[in-house]
Amino acid sequence: VIGGTNASPGEFPWQLSQQRQSGSWSHSCGASLLSSTSALSASHCVDGVLPNNIRVIAGLWQQSDTSGTQTANVDSYTMHENYGAGTASYSNDIAILHLATSISLGGNIQAAVLPANNNNDYAGTTCVISGWGRTDGTNNLPDILQKSSIPVITTAQCTAAMVGVGGANIWDNHICVQDPAGNTGACNGDSGGPLNCPDGGTRVVGVTSWVVSSGLGTCLPDYPSVYTRVSAYLGWIGDNSR
C-alpha cells in the first residue's frame, strides 16, 4: 500500500499473507479467509505456481512476529476458467485456495463476509485497502500490515481515468478505488488481498488485481487501483469453495 498507515492488530481478521517458497518462504500476495479451509485470492497470484509452494498465514499483523498466528499449506487451488492471463487487465482475476489443514476461527482470525448480492456498486463509498505490498518505489515490503481509506469510483470514472494507459481495460466485473489527491493506492504484494467496504459491517467487496506503474515498476497512485468485483462472482465462489 502506497501512502498508507499501520493497521491495528486484528483490524482485518480475514486478511491472510499468501507466501511463496523459493528457497525460503516469503510474502507474495494477500488473500482473504472464506472458511476454515478456503481462501479467496487472485488468479495471477497462483498462475503457474505449484500448490506445495504456496502457504497462507492467518492472524498475522507483523511479518517478523508470527506469535498467535496459524499457518496452512495449500493443497490445490481453483483459478477462474476464464482468467485472462497475458492481458494487461487480468480479466476474471479471482481464485480459491484450498487449504491442506483447517484454520481455527476466533479472535484475530475470522472468515470474510462477502456482499449479499450484485446490487451495490459501492461507488462513492469510502473503503479500506489493506496489505503487506510495497510502500514506495523499492522492492521493500512493510513489516506491519498497511491500510488506507480510498473512495470507490464508478466503472465509467475508472475507464476515463485509464485513458492513455496501454492495455488498461475496465469491465463491470472490476471495482476501482482512486485517491482524489493521488497519494495512496495499492502496489505489488497487495494483490489477492481484500477491498474492505462498510456495508452492514465490513464486507470484502474486491480482490486486489492490478495497478498502473511506471516503466521502472513504481506504482502510480494518481491512477485508480483495480480490484476484481467479488459480487460478480458469488455463484462461482460458492461453487468452488469448501
Curated annotation (Swiss-Prot):
The keyword Signal does not apply. CDD domains: Tryp_SPc. Its EC number is 3.4.21.-. Disulfide bonds join C29-C45, C127-C197, C158-C176, C187-C219. GO terms for molecular function: serine-type endopeptidase activity; toxin activity. Keywords: Disulfide bond, Fibrinolytic toxin, Hemostasis impairing toxin, Hydrolase, Protease, Serine protease, Toxin. GO terms for biological process: proteolysis. The active site is at H44, D93, S191. The keyword Manganese does not apply. Signal peptide: none annotated. InterPro entries: Peptidase_S1_PA (IPR009003), Peptidase_S1_PA_chymotrypsin (IPR043504), Peptidase_S1A (IPR001314), Trypsin_dom (IPR001254), TRYPSIN_HIS (IPR018114), TRYPSIN_SER (IPR033116). Residues 1-242 form the Peptidase S1 domain. Belongs to the peptidase S1 family. In L.rubellus there are at least three isozymes of fibrinolytic enzyme. This is Fibrinolytic enzyme, isozyme C. It comes from Lumbricus rubellus.
